[in-house]
């Protein structure tokens, strides 16, 4: 049993969660503070959550493919994207970012606005208000978003196989390894990878739930 799909999955989910964390909380804060087109912005950010992952992967191919202007620009800089590990990260970010965004936005909306008003009257900058007041006070919701984001990225399949492919040792994650094993009629290998993915997800979620319960007590 080759272990590269496990490490590729772990690296991809970790990188995607890291990127989605900063993008998600920044977008949540920005959307809450725009007056015009807030509904449109919210819909665009949330859209990948409701679209079939294969559709997301197809549009990623259109945007970053070799024949697209953006894809060609990356190629000119010597940075190919399609069917590389970077593509697995991009696919995971696109499908998991809405979860981070929605939970972070919900956490920010529940905060007492008087705290922010008081900080502003004291002359505290918006940057410090965001990182020193809003994020720490919304930490439980943000951590919940991180858990959802990581587990979503961990099990990503449709967008990944469309945009990054299923290249062993490069883009083959546990999910795509299961698909490849079933296609090869190797159900024993598929079962091993499926069990590993379930167990890893359970351990991660249980550990994060225990940490959240301890931090609230």
What function would you assign to each model-found segment?
Residues 65-66, 142-180:
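Non-cytoplasmic
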Residues 57-93, 164-167:
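Membrane-interfacial helix termini and adjacent extracytoplasmic/periplasmic loops
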Residues 2-33, 49:
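Transmembrane alpha-helix signature in integral membrane proteins
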Residues 34-41, 69, 84, 114, ...:
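Membrane-helix interface segments
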Residues 27-62, 116:
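Cytoplasmic-entry segments and transmembrane alpha-helices of multi-pass inner-membrane transporters
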Residues 37, 41, 98, 105-116, ...:
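C-terminal transmembrane helix and the adjacent membrane-cytosol boundary/short C-terminal tail
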Residues 18, 101-104, 108, 112, ...:
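Transmembrane alpha-helices
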Residues 1-4, 163-202, 206:
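Interhelical loop and adjacent transmembrane-helix boundary motif
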């Amino acid at each position: 049993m080759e272990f590269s799909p496990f490490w590729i999955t772990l690296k991809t989910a970790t990188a995607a969660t890291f990127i989605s964390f900063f993008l998600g909380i920044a977008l949540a804060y920005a959307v809450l503070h725009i007056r015009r087109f807030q509904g449109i912005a919210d819909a665009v950010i949330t859209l990948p959550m409701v679209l079939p992952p294969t559709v997301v992967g197809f549009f990623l191919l259109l945007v970053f493919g070799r024949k697209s202007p953006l894809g060609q620009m990356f190629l000119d800089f010597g940075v190919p994207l399609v069917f590389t590990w970077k593509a697995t990260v991009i696919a995971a970010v696109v499908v998991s970012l809405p979860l981070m965004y929605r939970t972070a936005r919900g956490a920010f909306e529940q905060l007492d606005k008087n705290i922010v008003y008081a900080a502003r009257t004291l002359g505290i900058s918006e940057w410090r208000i965001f990182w020193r007041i809003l994020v720490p006070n919304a930490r439980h919701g943000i951590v919940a978003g991180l858990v959802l984001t990581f587990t979503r990225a961990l099990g990503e399949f449709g967008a990944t196989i469309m945009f990054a492919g299923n290249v062993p040792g490069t883009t083959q994650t546990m999910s795509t390894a299961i698909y490849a094993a079933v296609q090869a009629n190797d159900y024993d290998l598929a079962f091993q990878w499926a069990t590993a993915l379930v167990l890893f997800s359970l351990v991660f979620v249980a550990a994060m739930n225990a940490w959240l319960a301890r931090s609230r007590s």
